[in-house]
Amino acid sequence: MHKSSNFSGLNLVKSAPICLLDIFHRCVDSETALDTSLLYLIDMFGTAVFAVSGVLLAGRLKMDPFGVMVLASVTAIGGGTIRDMALGATPVFWIKDTNYLWVIMITCALTMLLVRRPKRLAWWILPVCDAIGLAVFVGIGVEKALIYQDSALIAIIMGVITGCGGGIIRDVLAREIPMVLRSEVYATACIIGGIFHTTALAMGYSSSTALLSGVFSTLLIRLGAIRWHLSLPTFALTK
């Protein structure tokens, strides 16, 4: 069994150059706009980062390779799947483009090979990986929503769903309290990032500039919440 697992991992690692080459060809196609290329690369980056966060949590919980793959996959593509179904964008993105699945599998293999003892990692690594994936996916969600409709409000909601959906499924499967339900600022960072993104577009900035403004604003707010334990006032009913 051990040899078979190693063989499978090596096959995934060997497949990495092919997957990366396919992604590169998509991005340098002369007929593809710069904004589309940037969006695709950022989407792949967010997929990989969110997959890492799923692998690290699975490692801390001592899951088997199948459990690791499931947790990484739902984290990386869960939110986007919900978004596409809500927008009627079917078949969903990872069925139309299997590079997403390859990125997840390769990321799982590399993370399991390189990170031997997830329990000994610094406490902040998982939240920071989650924050990076969150920021990227909020931007992706807003952009994709605006392709299918014109409402800024719906775009922001789709951004929040894309960013938070996979993490919620991951935490529920792992029997953890979802990060979005904890006291620290989480969904609020997504909303503010979506507002920055849609406002920049309304002001006439390019899609790339608007996307990056939303991503970085979400990321900075979320990292600040992690560092200084920022939270919103709680609602509590007293007896």
Swiss-Prot record:
Listed Pfam families = Gly_transporter (PF03458)
Subcellular location per UniProt equals: Cell membrane
Keyword Nucleotide-binding part of the UniProt annotation: no
Alphabetical UniProt keywords = Cell membrane, Membrane, Transmembrane, Transmembrane helix
Top-rank taxon of the source lineage equals: Bacteria
Membrane-protein topology: Multi-pass membrane protein
Does Cell membrane count among this protein's keywords?
A: yes
Give TM segment ranges: 38-58, 62-82, 86-106, 122-142, 153-173, 185-205
Give Gene Ontology CC terms.
plasma membrane
Concerning its family, UniProt says:
Belongs to the UPF0126 family.
Q: Report what the protein is called.
A: UPF0126 membrane protein VC_2382
* Organism from which the protein derives: Vibrio cholerae serotype O1 (strain ATCC 39315 / El Tor Inaba N16961)
